[in-house]
Amino acid sequence: MGRLQDRVAVVTGAGEGIGAAIARRFSVEGARVVIAEIDETLGRATAETLAAESGNETRFVPTDVGRKADNEAMIAAAVEAWGRLDVLVNNAWGGGKISRAELKTDALIDDGLAVGFRGPLWAMQAAFPIMKEQGYGRVVNICSLNGVNAHMGTLEYNSAKEALRAATRTAAREWAATGIVCNVICPAAKSAAFHRVMAEHPELIAAADAANPTGRIGDPYDDISPVALFLASDDCRYVTGNTLFVDGGSHINGSAWAPDLPDEP
């Protein structure tokens, strides 16, 4: 029997990268998983692959986490399909652009906050009454070293993820007596977003590996998803409001991330 046997989980941004790795881990550990993903091709493919691999049910729900209605719909889809919701993983991110802080546009900042902060908060608010009624819930928010280490060029991303860390701690405190625990993972992994950024800055790939105390950036499935599994499991019942740095020690002395930033927004 898997560690999440018969549990129901929603994972956002689960079509690729860290989200797909976490969804896969949950599925092989017995969970029924909603793949909440904006890209229909990726989302459907992941749902089908996981169901075939694990034999457990999955459901793809097209989701733009920057829209409140979509966050509510993905939660409702899990309850409609399986009658409960045990685990919520807020992982999705919509992109952003590397540029100087003084050149960030209102639109770029608004988009970053909508996807990186408001979306996860809307999902948590939609999940809360269901988890409270059950007396059981696990919220895992995927944040980032970018905000912790003040990575250059990604102000809207850094700000959204640090706001989400604060919201996670607040929810953990307010919801502690209900059986809901809320925690954060700050990963260092070669995610889909990592590969997209590095495609624009290939010179930083070797530097990113070298800057990590272990000499490498982590793997989403082998390094990140086992920690998400712990935070989603019964074993996490007395752990709440924490940030787990699953990063090979990258947070210890900051980061060498220092790209040459463009002079236009």
Language-model regions, residue ranges each:
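Residue(s) in the substrate-gating loop at a strand-loop-helix junction
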Residues: 144
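Conserved glycine-rich cofactor-binding loop
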Residues: 8, 15-16
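Alpha-helical segment proximal to the catalytic Tyr-Lys
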Residues: 129, 173-177, 237
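Short C-terminal tail/terminal secondary-structure segment
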Residues: 98, 240-265
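Catalytic Tyr-X3-Lys loop
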Residues: 102-121, 136, 140, 157, ...
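C-terminal substrate-recognition "lid" of short-chain dehydrogenase/reductases
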Residues: 121-124, 136, 217-246, 251-252
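Conserved mid-core segment of classical short-chain dehydrogenase/reductases
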Residues: 72, 95-110, 133, 153-156, ...
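Active-site helix of classical SDR
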Residues: 124, 160, 168
